[in-house]
Curated annotation (Swiss-Prot):
Stretches for region N-domain: 18-197
Region of interest (4 X approximate repeats), residue spans: 191-255
Gene for this chain: CALR
Protein name: Calreticulin
Origin species: Oryctolagus cuniculus (Rabbit)
Ranges of Acidic residues composition bias in the record: 252-261, 380-409
Length: 418
């Protein structure tokens, strides 16, 4: 049956609008992840990932993810998917990160690699397409990295995007669009957006300062000048310090022994400081000279900054001082709405229960510490009471001994008298 052209085009449009999921990983099949994720053998001491939902969670099964398990280690683990290009379509990269160890220094980001990556040799210098996610190291570094590899060079964003630094699970989303715009979301809320060309130094600047232009010699940028008619008053110059007129030489001052007496100095009440002529508006003031700009002959627009020929591997290539971070709910798609919905159905469903469990644990820990502190104080008081009791018994014994000695002495004296 032949369909009318408008209906056919509409159906084709609906088909084209279906989201394409290139990669999705939720770790819902137990140890099955070990068949999909490859450990790099580039170094023999890479840290190990384990499957865990952590010490607290919203749903013990749904919140299971890859957790770093060894302190002060590099980690290198990756998963491959069917290669694709994002040319002509949006790219959405999304995952959750949970720093339940209250991380002090370590990465929580992912890298997207082209198809040519040797997963068993993946390491920190392996060339990637995009690096995205949180990075924390001390109080000075708490940022979201958004790094693109452009013509073989890793280019960092010019903006500072602050990441979450608490112990709970957070959803990170990067959207790269075919119009060379981007958006970064945390917990499904936009935290940054803009133009790739404006916020990264992919290209030379459109404008440069005219090399042939220079500030005219008579260009006066001084807004104020000294008043040429102003002059210093004749009585202006006074010393800053003067001898104290109330000081007197001590009566016992011996000039042969102590030298010539000089009175101490004090601040001169008539001292006025350095004289400066008053300021007036400069009649020759022309404002700040602005260097004229010209079109940069080195600049050439690139409509395909956003595009990569091949995405095929998602990798966790990072360093952590204190382990315990959990990665979960990985998603790579071409559909922004689908990614937002997926985030709400995963992180969004369990986040409240996760916090409730953590709050309950914290309250139980607080009560336990209070009880331990109470018990410790009671034991200390009991020990003090026991010591006081022993001291009292010793005093009583000493008193009894003293009384006995006095009685014996009295008896002896009476005997002598007899």
């Amino acid at each position: 049956m032949l369909l009318p052209v408008p209906l056919l085009l509409g159906l084709l449009g609906l088909a084209a609008a279906e989201p394409v999921v290139y990669f999705k990983e939720q770790f819902l099949d137990g140890d099955g992840w070990t068949e999909r994720w490859i450990e790099s053998k580039h170094k023999s001491d890479f840290g190990k990932f384990v499957l865990s939902s952590g010490k607290f969670y919203g749903d013990q099964e749904k919140d299971k993810g890859l957790q770093t398990s060894q302190d002060a280690r590099f980690y290198a683990l990756s998963a491959r998917f069917e290669p694709f290009s994002n040319k002509g379509q949006p790219l959405v990269v999304q995952f959750t990160v949970k720093h339940e160890q209250n991380i002090d220094c370590g990465g929580g980001y992912v890298k997207l690699f082209p198809a040519g990556l040797d997963q068993k040799d993946m390491h920190g210098d392996s060339e990637y397409n995009i690096m995205f996610g949180p990075d924390i190291c001390g109080p000075g570094t708490k940022k979201v990295h958004v790094i693109f590899n452009y013509k073989g060079k890793n280019v960092l964003i010019n903006k500072d995007i602050r990441c979450k630094d608490d112990e709970f699970t957070h959803l990170y989303t990067l959207i790269v669009r075919p119009d060379n715009t981007y958006e970064v979301k945390i917990d499904n809320s936009q935290v940054e957006s803009g133009s790739l060309e404006d916020d990264w130094d992919f290209l030379p600047p459109k404008k440069i300062k005219d090399p042939d232009a220079s500030k005219p010699e008579d260009w006066d940028e001084r807004a104020k000048i000294d008043d040429p008619t102003d002059s210093k008053p004749e009585d202006w110059d006074k010393p800053e310090h003067i001898p104290d007129p109330d000081a007197k030489k001590p009566e016992d001052w011996d000039e042969e022994m102590d030298g010539e007496w000089e009175p101490p100095v004090i601040q001169n009440p008539e001292y006025k400081g350095e004289w400066k002529p008053r300021q007036i508006d400069n009649p020759d003031y022309k404002g700040t000279w602005i260097h004229p700009e010209i079109d940069n002959p080195e600049y050439s627009p690139d409509a395909n900054i956003y595009a990569y020929d091949s995405f095929a591997v998602l990798g966790l290539d990072l360093w952590q001082v204190k382990s315990g971070t959990i990665f979960d709910n990985f998603l790579i798609t071409n559909d922004e709405a689908y990614a937002e919905e997926f985030g709400n159905e995963t992180w969004g469903v369990t986040k409240t229960a996760e916090k409730q469990m953590k709050d309950k644990q914290d309250e139980e820990q607080r009560l336990k510490e209070e009880e331990e502190e109470k018990k410790r104080k009671e034991e200390e008081e009991a020990e003090e009471d026991e010591e006081d009791k022993d001291d009292k018994e010793d005093e009583d014994e000493d008193e009894e001994d003293k009384d006995e000695e006095e009685e014996e002495a009295a008896a002896g004296q009476a005997k002598d008298e007899l």
